[in-house]
């Protein structure tokens, strides 16, 4: 346990970090249930939490309000703890349309979803780490409070194999089928197995690149090895191995049979109710849909929408909370909630929205009443299941303020940077004044963020700035997570200088190049111009030594005054600390990395990483010779079932043919 977690960093805690770390550790050791880390933007809150995790030596779940921040945190913790199990648990849907019914137009919308296989693998890897390891750090979104397969059923479905043990091949293959692995005779992919005589190759669902080879001899496990499924190279011999199921929803056969019987009983009760109310169409619809699901479960062990029967599959009573990621956490775990002023209300709102949609489905005969128990946790259930918790925010919400037993303040930054200077200027000339400020900041080689109140205003401002020769982009709500991170990355790289948005430029975005934040119509009181929103938005310029914020307003609202007072209080404390310790503020030099590396696999990144070689200086004869050589390699790889290598060579082959045609 001595070095269970080890931080790799060139820096030591500085500024307010040592005090905050000591305060939080003391609170945890004293048994405090809830604490808050009130840390300003750029004060190194992630580094502080990393030191708390290292000191406490406990598995940790970190929750972020969205996939963007979760990916950023995942990258940072992965860098701090390269020797530990840092995992990523977010929704695996690239696209998700839930099942719904609109009575007004008699429209039923089928469930439609596109699952990201890479994220599904990372989710399985996360629960595996919690089961197998004491040094797990799981970075998650609110997806953590949604129903997941029952851990007891999941653990009963594991396949354990040891070298030298007696094991019949047919039993192993049957077990793999029960675990929902599919058999293949071609290239081995995640969640598949392949049989070649007495050799069974398995590509575990939780593994990204490595597969397992089981060699049998006379019904005895003769050898176990990890190997590369692409090249076939043996990487390591193993004394034993545990294969985890392909999905969290895998269920033992006897539980499936019990579920089917309970579903049949509920179906008869519900049909009697609907017929008594003369809802004949609803009764016929429910019977048809449920009988189809029952048949699928009996034949295949699962059905589309099997999560709607999760009450029976996990053997729970009506109304009981569903199993979630929290059920996989050990009792001594820590819970960290990042940007808690956003995440906590988000957790509280999930249950009600889900319930309203499902009640309509139940009332109109699309689902049995037990489907209502396939739901996210209610807020009180989340509180019951939460281990010791630390909330992190620059602007804690009312819940954290009321329930925290200890508040550790982290106002002084390790870099000595002070909060941005805030100016107030009139609304009447805001656009022209902003244009002049933008030109000055661009001349210094820095970037600008501008927030507006409406989508229309953001579009018009973007068009106006663009017409005047300014490189500007508009970040709107339709941009997906990956594209959004690419836009922010391009801003940092200087592909453009000004980013205009509405409510998308607040929490957690790490952009040290931004020297000016402009808030238009700052005196329009409301959600987008509340005290918390203003402090968070002003904070986007806090990572730059020349950081400034301009609020365009004709009146000073209550929210503005409170935000200005808090910013000034922090500035005074930071200046006093710098003066006392002789610190000169330094800007943050942070490399522009793809923070989604490991969390997403994008086409753009692949193209950059795998730029095909150019043969512009070759003669036609040399090109033709190279084309023939590549063609032979391509077919050789294809015959060896090394299709990925064959595809790479094919791309190069086509490129050369194209060049030859141009000569």
UniProtKB/Swiss-Prot annotation:
Q: Extract the NCBIfam families matched here.
A: PRK05298.1, uvrb
Task: List, alphabetically, the GO terms of the cellular component aspect.
Answer: cytoplasm; excinuclease repair complex
**Gene behind the chain:** uvrB
Specify the Helicase C-terminal domain's residue ranges. 430-596
Q: Where in the cell is it found?
A: Cytoplasm
Q: Which family does it belong to?
A: Belongs to the UvrB family.
| InterPro entries (alphabetical) | Helicase/UvrB_N, Helicase_ATP-bd, Helicase_C-like, P-loop_NTPase, UVR_dom, UVR_dom_sf, UvrB, UvrB_inter
What is the scientific name of the source organism?
Legionella pneumophila (strain Lens)
What UniProt notes about the protein's domains is:
The beta-hairpin motif is involved in DNA binding.
Tell me which UniProt keywords the record has, alphabetically.
ATP-binding, Cytoplasm, DNA damage, DNA excision, DNA repair, Excision nuclease, Nucleotide-binding, SOS response
Q: Provide the coiled-coil residue spans.
A: none
Residues annotated as domain UVR:
624-659
Q: Name one GO molecular function term.
A: DNA binding
Major localization listed first in the record, in broad terms: cytoplasm
Which PANTHER family does the annotation name?
Answer: UVRABC SYSTEM PROTEIN B (PTHR24029:SF0)
Coordinates of motif Beta-hairpin in the sequence? 92-115
Start and end residues of each Helicase ATP-binding domain = 26-414
Q: Does the keyword Transferase apply?
A: no
What does the subunit comment say? Forms a heterotetramer with UvrA during the search for lesions. Interacts with UvrC in an incision complex.
Q: Which positions in this protein are listed as binding ATP?
A: 39-46
- On the tree of life, the source organism's domain of life is Bacteria
- This one is known as UvrABC system protein B
HAMAP family listed in its UniProt record: UvrB (MF_00204)
Please explain the role this protein plays, according to its UniProt record: The UvrABC repair system catalyzes the recognition and processing of DNA lesions. A damage recognition complex composed of 2 UvrA and 2 UvrB subunits scans DNA for abnormalities. Upon binding of the UvrA(2)B(2) complex to a putative damaged site, the DNA wraps around one UvrB monomer. DNA wrap is dependent on ATP binding by UvrB and probably causes local melting of the DNA helix, facilitating insertion of UvrB beta-hairpin between the DNA strands. Then UvrB probes one DNA strand for the presence of a lesion.
What PROSITE patterns would the database entry show?
Answer: HELICASE_ATP_BIND_1, HELICASE_CTER, UVR
